[in-house]
Amino acid sequence: MGDIKNFLYAWCGKRKMTPAYEIRAVGNKNRQKFMCEVRVEGFNYAGMGNSTNKKDAQSNAARDFVNYLVRINEVKSEEVPAVGIVPPPPILSDTSDSTASAAEGLPAPMGGPLPPHLALKAEENNSGVESSGYGSPGPTWDRGANLKDYYSRKEEQEVQATLESEEVDLNAGLHGNWTLENAKARLNQYFQKEKIQGEYKYTQVGPDHNRSFIAEMTIYIKQLGRRIFAREHGSNKKLAAQSCALSLVRQLYHLGVIEAYSGLTKKKEGERVEPYKVFLSPDLELQLQNVVQELDLEIVPPPVDPSMPVILNIGKLAHFEPSQRQNAVGVVPWSPPQSNWNPWTSSNIDEGPLAYASTEQISMDLKNELTYQMEQDHNLQSVLQERELLPVKKFEAEILEAISSNSVVIIRGATGCGKTTQVPQYILDDFIQNDRAAECNIVVTQPRRISAVAVAERVAYERGEEPGKSCGYSVRFESILPRPHASIMFCTVGVLLRKLEAGIRGISHVIVDEIHERDINTDFLLVVLRDVVLAYPEVRIVLMSATIDTTMFCEYFFNCPIIEVYGRTFPVQEYFLEDCIQMTQFIPPPKDKKKKDKEDDGGEDDDANCNLICGDEYGPETKLSMSQLNEKETPFELIEALLKYIETLNVPGAVLVFLPGWNLIYTMQKHLENNSHFGSHRYQILPLHSQIPREEQRKVFDPVPDGVTKVILSTNIAETSITINDVVYVIDSCKQKVKLFTAHNNMTNYATVWASKTNLEQRKGRAGRVRPGFCFHLCSRARFDRLETHMTPEMFRTPLHEIALSIKLLRLGGIGQFLAKAIEPPPLDAIIEAEHTLRELDALDANDELTPLGRILAKLPIEPRFGKMMIMGCIFYVGDAVCTISAATCFPEPFISEGKRLGYIHRNFAGNRFSDHVALLSVFQAWDDARMSGEEAEIRFCEQKRLNMATLRMTWEAKVQLKEILINSGFPEDCLLTQVFTNTGPDNNLDVVISLLAFGVYPNVCYHKEKRKILTTEGRNALIHKSSVNCPFSSQDMKYPSPFFVFGEKIRTRAISAKGMTLVTPLQLLLFASKKVQSDGQIVFIDDWIRLQISHEAAACITIRAAMEALVVEVSKQPNIISQLDPVNEHMLNTIRQISRPSAAGINLMIGSVRYGDGPRPPKMARYDNGSGYRRGYGGGGYGGGGYGGGYGSGGFGGGFGSGGGFGGGFNSGGGGFGSGGGGFGSGGGGFGGGGGGFSGGGGGGFGGGRGGGGGGFGGSGGFGNGGGGYGVGGGGYGGGGGGGYGGGSGGYGGGGYGGGEGYSISPNSYRGNYGGGGGGYRGGSQGGYRNNFGGDYRGSSGDYRGSGGGYRGSGGFQRRGYGGGYFGQGRGGGGGGGY
């Protein structure tokens, strides 16, 4: 293959160009690959190779680029050196000319002339998509018109600022100093001048006790010829309108229509915080000053005049070198399927028959296989007959014809017509039958995990296969990938976006399902695909949607054709609230709550109670009952009455109840189960929510026996994503839960809002799958008429930081320019906010390109600030804990609580730390311990402690995924090892975790006043959230050791409350949770509102924060330097550890602490498992209990090595348990197995105690502690130099001992060493052995050790990456059963 590189070099040489190769290592140490990209100037395409060695990677990249040159007719295919045949360019239409001009890339409209923006585009684009693959930057459809003006003006201003050598305070002038106070007046002035009638449109959200408002407005700007839009949220109408005006004014400012605010900004004086006296020991102050000197930092002297305070923060000490500004608008590279490329792993196929097979050969084999299967498999024939009956079948020929002739096609079909499962199969089977199987690979996106998995399993069943052959799926934490050619992969949109970094290579068709849902990822993907279609007209995009108005999508994709698929025609009769009351003769129960006085909502409530509007055709009783129901509440009693009414109809069928959010589902489930009628065997009540485990989710599809009614309580997940065939009745609350975010005050609100008419139409369609159905809408007809037609796109109500990072990672050009091309572009102020946040985090450099830190953050599926916190956690060797806390923030709390406040059983998890985050960490640690004893123990633990097991399992998955990404980015594994934390006594590692948390959640800082009352930024009032461990019971007052807290998010209800709170010391705030620190010599001011009484010199040592940030810069460039930091940096880190201790600020956590109920925690033994189930030394996971081949001893999970009982009693049958007796893992005299004994024999010290000692070994004569030295001491290795191995005799675990004569280098936190001793392997004989770091992948060179039947849900290999056994495999123990 080498001559392909020479061919490309020669071709470029003739044109006076040189190919530029860029190569980097990817994957983990055990299966390292090399990714190579080759670019040639003037071509907007990167050839890619991903192989096991550098040479092949370069050759494959060169071949990919040459194939691209063939496709765009720059090179003739017969000139290309052989080996792997280049597929001919796919034929677009009947024309023989395969040169695709841009005009052909824009499919012809379905009738009538081209609309003006497209006619202009076609003219501009005639030179279009040639060598560059994209055309000039000019001809992008100017949806976000005039954004270019903003960016070009911004560049001029940057140049001017540089000339004046003026340090600009970016934040103050970020939006022209326009604030909530001054924006509305300026907007009104603008309206008067331009003679605009500006009216706010208000929507009320939430129930009465928690009411808030959304204000929105669209205005047309004459001088720019475009509209701008704002939609903001506030606790009353006045605030919502002010926020909406602020967004509009900021956008007008950025577009150059209005000036910056030049008056004095009047800040509302918040409540003053009294100066807090900080006690700092002289020793620590001296240590601080020494570090500052060592780091060569300058301390600002105190001011001469106290009324002129000085700023103590110093600027950044280290910057990333600015990379070259990317001027070309990027596009994600695409190439058709090729012979030796696997699109699902984005790598070349280097070995096996497929590495050298031609596309013709592959196509022939697959056709023969399908033909044989059709003839022989009788089940398949009956499934085919079922498929024939689906409504979409009649449209098969029309769909295939449209897809063949157009780059983009929209298929619109009623729910249940079969489009999701059938369209991909029609395309695939068409290619296979026409001898083009190797030219077809289809990716299908779904908005949710449950639908991606359920649809993939259904399609595999219809093809007579298991997932993993022609059909597979990939969702976060779980994948079964299909074969590399002629296959369909179902995935979530998020997973596809992560795969885009390697391009859409080897994929012939991209199908985007449920486009009407308008989540932020789908909207982002549509912009990417639109650009891809312009650059590569041969790609095929199919957009699928429910029966809604698709005009907007059709125009966005150049007036592409729409195919209408009609569904099964079982009618669905719909009823509204007044009908439901009349039918059931429902009388609402008397209200037991006294109504609170209405707070001032800032104006008239125009969102009238529609329950007072009832037509004359209904009786007076109905009108009265209806008027007594509160529109904002979900009437459980009426749902109950409807279920009883359904019983009387004697029409069997499942009932699907749509409810907004998990809380209502859980409450409704308990409400029904506690009712003697619905809790009986005649009913099966099933919840359906994205957060419940897959096994639970699957139950909703299972049929129930005769005489049993299945009632499914679901969120909008069942609206479009999945189809439950036996549903006949739908009861619809007509509501859904949305997350609203307001940027200017960093406020989150989870509001229950009315669903849109489109949503209600979808929900209605779920009934009537098998027979005529019934839909009961729990809203009045009057309310229905007032509903919005569509929901607001998520892009308008969520921060854009993560999407902005993805844009830069995929090299798609400027963030603003890219988002301006969205189907509905987000407001400009939100884009600028995101760019600014990323610059502050050092994720973007001076040219707005990704820094090495930004590149790591872009790969982590988590909020960028948390990502940086995780990197800092790795530097301090507490990476695992920080990853756990970050993962836990992605999910609801695991506590199952009846009331709003947590009970003692949950508060206990916080120990003495006054911290919700520590409670989460402790819960996770305790659950992780419990599950080591098997699944039954895990279930028992969760029931006893009232914890949601599903949430804990998903947190584990997310944590492991985050750690894997960091390890693959080059971070040493030993900085991510699991540690044991104590929440009841001193623990410096936990102190450091809390310091880093203060950085991660900044600017969310608050000060406790009394009872639940706290002050947040700028002294504004708020409350401790009732779900916090810090929330006092009833009205009792609480005294905390420190009044300062950091918190996860501000939730706006009637009041503003802080959720997820952790107590911090003032020194932790000073160091990690501050932006502006000033001193007048006596008092230090943090961010203009917190005042500390601390010496100027001590406070000035805040400057070491800059040194810490500089270290993050260096570590991001080269993560492996963490394990060999220079003494100055080590000294700085140790000083930060000291500052993080509560005692450093004179705070005693034991004071004021109330310990509830359970008494002190028993001592724990150390764990070094990398979170992967390889725990408690050697017995817990992997090969100690059930794992590989059933483990060593008999016994169950932890029965392992000895014959003894379970976890505590095991390992050495008699005598103490695992860490009982004289001490645990690394403590004093005792060894691993307690007392004086070794693991299962006599002898001296054990694992970490003493020096290894004599004869007693793991399984007999030689072994673990044998030979010269012990664990890390002196000459001997892990198992000493002796002959015995793990299982005695010569063969044993590692032949010549665990690490041969290597020794075991031990630095404070590192356990690195080579585990692959001499001759013996795991089962003797093989030459491999455990050759890797202590908590990583355990794979010997010659064989891997997966339990034969085990594996994560049966798939083999821990988390499908071969981490020691499985994760609750089939047998939890015994031979071949799996285990951890």
Curated annotation (Swiss-Prot):
Residues 232-327 are annotated as: Interaction with BRCA1. PANTHER family: ATP-DEPENDENT RNA HELICASE (PTHR18934), ATP-DEPENDENT RNA HELICASE A (PTHR18934:SF119). It comes from Mus musculus (Mouse). Residues 315-954 are annotated as: Necessary for interaction with H2AX. Residues 833-921 are annotated as: HA2. This is ATP-dependent RNA helicase A. DRBM domains cooperate for the binding to nucleic acid but not for unwinding helicase activity. The helicase-associated domain-2 (HA2) region is essential for the duplex RNA unwinding helicase activity. The minimal transactivation region (MTAD) mediates interaction with the RNA polymerase II holoenzyme and stimulates transcriptional activation in a CREB-dependent manner. The oligonucleotide- or oligosaccharide-binding (OB-fold) and the repeated arginine and glycine-glycine (RGG) regions are dispensable for both RNA-binding and unwinding helicase activities. Residues 93-109 have a biased composition (Low complexity). Methylated. PRMT1-mediated methylation of undefined Arg residues in the nuclear transport domain (NTD) is required for nuclear import of DHX9. Residues 960-1076 are annotated as: OB-fold. Residues 400-811 are annotated as: Core helicase. It is an enzyme of class 3 (hydrolase).
